[in-house]
Design a protein with these regions (language model features):
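Cys/His-rich short segments
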Residues: 16-68, 72
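Feature captures the FAD/FMN-dependent oxidoreductase FAD-binding
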Residues: 1-16
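Short, polar/flexible loop-turn hinges at active-site or ligand-entry regions and domain interfaces
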Residues: 14-19, 78-82
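Structured secondary-structure scaffolds
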Residues: 2-3, 48-49, 55-179
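Short alpha-helical interface elements
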Residues: 2-5, 32-37, 96
Length: 179
């Protein structure tokens, strides 16, 4: 929790977060926001999402988009950064053909009590990807072994979480001036 709060505060102090109103659709069953892209061809959301409701709420966002070109350049200059080649090409294709949307990093505490409070606004919590990715720093730091265990030489992940590890995580590290 302490490392997550530290990284959040660092990024906030550097101006990497902003608050804005989210207007969209929310699946309570999947605990995720949905976009028009998530609708089936007939315009209906898949039953896997359960009841989907329109939602308006203020949240904090991480400015991923302003780091998009940096990440493209970094991956191009470091071809072994994402392997195998077809996964690197998948990430680069995504980055070069899509506009990277800023990442919502919070939920109002009144709606979601179990997250980690934002150190700069305790009416909000962060949860899931921001805190999960920051755990790669939390464990080595808590054991006093950060220099030995981080950064990792190789990081093996599943294909279903490629975007989080090959896009969000490196941008988070770069924005926080961490390796």
């Amino acid at each position: 929790v302490a490392v997550v709060a530290e990284v959040l505060q660092q990024l906030y102090d550097k101006g990497e977060f902003y608050q804005d109103e989210y207007v969209g659709f929310y699946s309570a069953k999947q605990e995720t926001f949905l976009t028009e892209k998530d609708r089936n061809e007939d315009g209906v959301f898949d039953p896997i999402y359960g009841e989907v409701q329109e939602l308006r709420e203020k949240n904090y966002y991480f400015k991923l988009g302003q780091h998009q070109q940096w990440l493209i350049d970094y991956i191009d200059a470091n071809p072994d950064f994402v392997a195998p080649d077809y996964r690197r090409n998948e990430v680069l294709g995504f980055l070069k053909n899509e506009t990277l949307e800023d990442l919502c990093i919070s939920r109002p505490k009144e709606r979601l009590e179990w997250g980690i409070p934002l150190p700069f606004d305790t009416d909000y919590v962060t949860y899931v990807w921001f805190d999960a990715l920051t755990n790669y720093l939390s464990i080595p730091r808590s054991r006093g072994e950060e220099a030995e265990l981080w950064p990792a030489d190789i990081h093996v992940i599943g294909k279903d979480i490629l975007k989080f590890h090959a896009v969000y995580w490196p941008i988070m590290l770069k924005a926080a001036d961490l390796e």
